[in-house]
Amino acid sequence: MSKRGARTPGYWYDNTPIPLPARMLAPVYGAVTAVRRSLYRRGWLKRHGVPVPVVVIGNVTAGGTGKTPLTITLVSRLQQAGWTPGVASRGYGRDDAGTARWVDADTPVALGGDEPVLIAWKTGARVRVDTDRLAAARALVEAGCDIIVCDDGLQHYRLARDVEIEVVDGQRRYGNGRMLPAGPLREPAARARECDFRVVNLGQGSDAVIPVVGTPVADTDAGFGEWQMRLSIDSVQPMDGKRARPLASLAGQRVHAVAGIAHPERFFAMLRARGIGVVPHAFPDHHVYRAQDFSFGSRLPVLMTEKDAVKCRPFADEWLYSVPLKAELPAAFWVSLLDRLDKLASRHSDA
């Protein structure tokens, strides 16, 4: 198995001893985080809104939890419901991180960031990358968007929000419960209870959806419950432009599987569960691929996540395939969320 680059520290999620420097820095990080949040709560630091509903998708832990598949699915659902959503993102990993820009499906990943380019490619929505989420939201409103989806902006308190959706890994949850860098927490785990919706990413698991906390459909302004999300794969898309084929057509075959995501083993496990023989190649999250990265020494199909695929389009050939990932949540979740957003739209129009 190829392993390149840094990985999530093991002590975040197991009983490995925490290094002394990390233990010493965690209280400092926690104190700074608490002071900053308190300043916003007391109004000493001001929040600024925009004249349309704002939905923030984020997490209180560092690392991937499935926010991007959920963002793509949410944007698609909003479009189907008649909204014109715009997506605000920081665009992590791009070369000119300090520059605000519009992102579409053809934007080079080095300029737009892999996740924003993927979102634009999959949805066709307006996407704006900017370290200042408020400025991004304002630009999207000026461009005609009537709802803002903020990708990974839970801690960006300067932008006022109407709905918060927290996404958490169903297996790892909040790890050892410690603040960065001693643990995975960006904020105390209790912060998650303040969010309107909690989505638990089960990965490739049962499609049964059970609300655990709160009421899944309610008329109140908060406490819409905890929902389980399942990620599914059922097809592969040749990157040379040919038609997609069922993933089942590769059952019993060996493939090279490439993943430059926070938890690459999840992708490999999903392929194995479909009866595919996986030769795994894990790369760092947000890795910038070169053609040489795919010199594996054996000519087998190369399967990769769509997040990786958007970075490989310049040198794609007939051996490279992307695997679309779908986020599946219960119908009641969408009823609850869309009903809330309809009410918010009325409030904003009356303001």
From Swiss-Prot:
Please give the biological process terms from Gene Ontology that the record holds: lipid A biosynthetic process; lipopolysaccharide core region biosynthetic process
GO CC terms for this protein?
Answer: plasma membrane
Judging by the UniProt lineage, the source's domain of life is Bacteria
Stated EC number for the protein is: 2.7.1.130
Q: What is the lineage of its organism?
A: Bacteria, Pseudomonadati, Pseudomonadota, Gammaproteobacteria, Lysobacterales
The pathway it acts in is: Glycolipid biosynthesis; lipid IV(A) biosynthesis; lipid IV(A) from (3R)-3-hydroxytetradecanoyl-[acyl-carrier-protein] and UDP-N-acetyl-alpha-D-glucosamine: step 6/6
Q: What's the protein here called?
A: Tetraacyldisaccharide 4'-kinase
> Record's family?
Belongs to the LpxK family.
The set of disulfide-linked cysteines is: none
Q: Which reaction does it catalyse?
A: a lipid A disaccharide + ATP = a lipid IVA + ADP + H(+)
Q: Which NCBIfam families match?
A: lpxK (TIGR00682)
What are the record keywords, sorted?
ATP-binding, Kinase, Lipid A biosynthesis, Lipid biosynthesis, Lipid metabolism, Nucleotide-binding, Transferase
InterPro entries reported for this sequence:
LpxK, P-loop_NTPase
Q: What does this protein do, in the record's words?
A: Transfers the gamma-phosphate of ATP to the 4'-position of a tetraacyldisaccharide 1-phosphate intermediate (termed DS-1-P) to form tetraacyldisaccharide 1,4'-bis-phosphate (lipid IVA).
- The entry marks the following residues as binding ATP, namely T61, A62, G63, G64, T65, G66, K67, T68
* Entry's Gene Ontology molecular function annotations: ATP binding; tetraacyldisaccharide 4'-kinase activity
Q: Its gene?
A: lpxK
Q: Which PANTHER family match?
A: TETRAACYLDISACCHARIDE 4'-KINASE, TETRAACYLDISACCHARIDE 4'-KINASE, MITOCHONDRIAL-RELATED
